[in-house]
């Protein structure tokens, strides 16, 4: 559990503090715990209740490999000290994390969602703009500018193995690439079903 700091075993962390200033710091601590844990373990998704999902097959909907959908931990439930966070407080943490741009609420289809349709969260230990800059750097360093590259190649290709975005789910990759399109540095290509499948960066 080296990815979790000592404060994770501090019982009061799991009880919503009544004082607003204390609670603000408490929420900030939780956000740091989530971000650091997911970065260290390279986890992209968490469910609404805080369950960490180590799953790179959600985009394809594959259920053939049980190991691909292995649930490893619920961060808001610490069995070692018999403490858990209430769902009401979990929702408050997610809300603040979303405001800070450190997570992205998505629905079952992998699209950005409203509170009522959210089924899980993409965890952004880098901002969307930071991911976009890193991906742009890869295009420049690898000599791929002005070439059409599929999202699958970006996520799963051998040429990205040593880059932090390797194995990023394609539905998250879309949101990380969008800032490049907004800056007129990239164009997305879609298939006959209007799904983005590739990108050209200039």
UniProtKB/Swiss-Prot annotation:
Membrane topology: Peripheral membrane protein
InterPro entries (UniProt xref): ESCRT-II_cplx_Vps25-sub, ESCRT-II_cplx_Vps25-sub_N, WH-like_DNA-bd_sf, WH_DNA-bd_sf
Compartments (UniProt record): Cytoplasm; Endosome membrane
One GO term of the biological process aspect: protein targeting to vacuole
Gene Ontology cellular-component terms listed: cytosol; ESCRT II complex
UniProt-recorded Gene Ontology molecular function terms: protein homodimerization activity; structural molecule activity
Keywords: Cytoplasm, Endosome, Membrane, Protein transport, Transport
Family: Belongs to the VPS25 family.
Functional description taken from the UniProt entry: Component of the ESCRT-II complex (endosomal sorting complex required for transport II), which is required for multivesicular body (MVB) formation and sorting of endosomal cargo proteins into MVBs. The MVB pathway mediates delivery of transmembrane proteins into the lumen of the lysosome for degradation. The ESCRT-II complex is probably involved in the recruitment of the ESCRT-III complex.
Subunit note: Homodimer. Component of the endosomal sorting complex required for transport II (ESCRT-II), which consists of 2 copies of VPS25, 1 copy of SNF8, and 1 copy of VPS36. The ESCRT-II complex interacts directly with the VPS20 subunit of the ESCRT-III complex.
Name this polypeptide is given: Vacuolar protein-sorting-associated protein 25
Species, as recorded: Saccharomyces cerevisiae (strain ATCC 204508 / S288c)
